[in-house]
Amino acid sequence: MKCFLFSGGDKRGEQKTPISVSLTSIFSDREINRSGSEFNSRDVSGTSTESSMGRKNSYPPVSTRASNLREFSITDLKSATKNFSRSVMIGEGGFGCVFRGTVRNLEDSSVKIEVAVKQLGKRGLQGHKEWVTEVNFLGIVEHTNLVKLLGYCAEDDERGIQRLLVYEYMPNRSVEFHLSPRSLTVLTWDLRLRIAQDAARGLTYLHEEMEFQIIFRDFKSSNILLDEDWKAKLSDFGLARLGPSEGLTHVSTDVVGTMGYAAPEYIQTGRLTSKSDVWGYGVFLYELITGRRPVDRNRPKGEQKLLEWVRPYLSDTRKFKLILDPRLEGKYPIKSVQKLAVVANRCLVRNSKARPKMSEVLEMVNKIVEASSGNGSPQLVPLNSVKASRDARGKNNGGGGEGGWFGKLWNPKTIRAC
């Protein structure tokens, strides 16, 4: 059987390698219709088939598309990053390294702006393709929930060809970081809802609001960054692909991505659609709810795969509370959390055609945010630390009495990719 290429996580220096994959779906089509009634919205099951509806099928050359981007010299970026010093390194992985730096503002040379400089590792053709992809996509798209690409550099120096990208600096790091034990900051429930909303807006723009469709293909919490106001923005488009051409339902491609986020039909067939991103978004919602990673080998065996772990707890409210992120310390409206889980469940239908489009997902999330805002001023600034969270402990304002809100669960299958 064909082996599929995955990245097994965000470990430092980890390269994509063939691995065996086991993914399970949460819902059957019938169950998704039942859970969706929470929103009093039209049934979206089975109504969506992917078509580009006239979207373009090829990209113009980088040189014509990158006209809005600033071209940096390697000297500029060495100066900006203290010669790529480890003292200003803010990220490292199989793709290369990211450095914090400062560059002069083009409109006012006396003003310096903070930037993030991504130095791609020397991975031959694949590394160059991912660099070109980022320049192609981010050179022409602009949205408040996408990290802005400011410029690029492709230049030879004593170490050979250097491929670099320069982004707006995102001071509050990634959502993945703040959900991990490494962070002393606690993302409040209100802020998690806004992050879910921001991420849905970004994906909706990519899928539906341009003349061509972009499929992210590597949607995950480590690729969702937070600006100084804690607004979430999607980043890292090196694996992104154009959506299907007119008249086609999917793109056939090598299977790449991150363990725990890839849709089962994509793993099995290599057929990529925007519904693959919708699946990944559903996984991400359970990350926000539980504070856990999709795959965590450091946990006990029965808790290592997030979707498998949550499944037994979803049948009634009392059990459901046991999967909520303990760092929230009970400060959430339980109905709000349940409704977000319903959205996640819609995204995790095994039949990809029965999953909602991202615009429909966004509409559902918007309703949850609006209802949450109606309960008082939302707490959008995270708590400073776990201790501060304990000191501010209050009563759980959630309610009970909604046993069976989830419905019967689908019996999962194991899918082996190799």
From Swiss-Prot:
Q: What's the subunit arrangement here?
A: Interacts with FLS2.
Q: Give me the ranges of the annotated region Disordered.
A: 36-63
> Where found, per UniProt?
Cell membrane
Q: Which organism is it from?
A: Arabidopsis thaliana
Inducing factors: Induced by infection with the bacterial pathogen Pseudomonas syringae pv maculicola strain ES4326, but not by microbe-associated molecular patterns (MAMPs) such as flg22.
Q: Write down the superkingdom of origin.
A: Eukaryota
What name is this protein filed under? Serine/threonine-protein kinase PCRK1
Q: Which SUPFAM superfamilies match?
A: Protein kinase-like (PK-like)
